[in-house]
Amino acid sequence: HVLVLVVSNDLGAALIFFVVYLLMLFTATKKVSYLFAGLGAGSVAAVLAYHIFSHVKNRVTIWLDPWSTIDTTGYQICQSLFAIGMGSWFGYGLGQGMPDKIPVAEKDFMFSALTEEFGIIFSVALLLICLNNLILMMNIASRCKTLFYRLVAVGLGVTYGFQVFLTVGGAIKMIPMTGVTLPFVS
């Protein structure tokens, strides 16, 4: 599954599937060596992706210094950061911001658009709700008696939590952009 996504250039989804597979394997076997082997393989895959895929190299370059290319390739992340900053504590209000300034705001940069219109307090509350959902999913997984159901719950929880991390992390320039949407929001 991961290779099909890599071949189709959907590396954000491939990364999510890889992390889910890795954590489900660890949950099923409890072998830390598998976890470290997966982290090593993932690190090698990240370096290879950087050298093979030009859009990955471009996203890393933008992530490192978006301000030098603010008029071209760095425009999206710079507008995202401007929107978050302009939203301040309480935001402009519903429909009062300018999320259309951020290209594809309705998908990968929904967090920035929401922060601009509703403020940082709302965004922190949204992140706490996401964290609460993740904790609930992991709590359900820990209570499952059957391995199959535990793996399903862990898989869903990790998919949700990692997708939130990738989306918000990309919007605030903590990690390079991945093109992944914010679950249940975007």
Where are each of the predicted segments found?
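Loop-to-helix entry and N-terminal half of a specific, functionally important transmembrane alpha helix
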Residues: 141-179, 185
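Hydrophobic alpha-helical interface/terminus motif in multipass membrane transporters
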Residues: 60, 137-141
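Transmembrane alpha-helices of multi-pass, membrane-embedded glycan-processing enzymes
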Residues: 126-133
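Hydrophobic alpha-helical segments of polytopic membrane proteins
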Residues: 1-51
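Transmembrane alpha-helix interface/packing and boundary motifs in multi-pass membrane proteins
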Residues: 1-9, 86-91, 166, 174-182
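Alpha-helical transmembrane segments of multi-pass membrane proteins
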Residues: 5, 46, 50, 129, ...
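Hydrophobic, glycine- and aromatic-enriched re-entrant/interface helices and adjoining loop segments
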Residues: 34-126, 145-152
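Membrane-interface segments at transmembrane-helix junctions in multi-pass inner-membrane proteins
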Residues: 6-8, 12-13, 68-71, 182-186
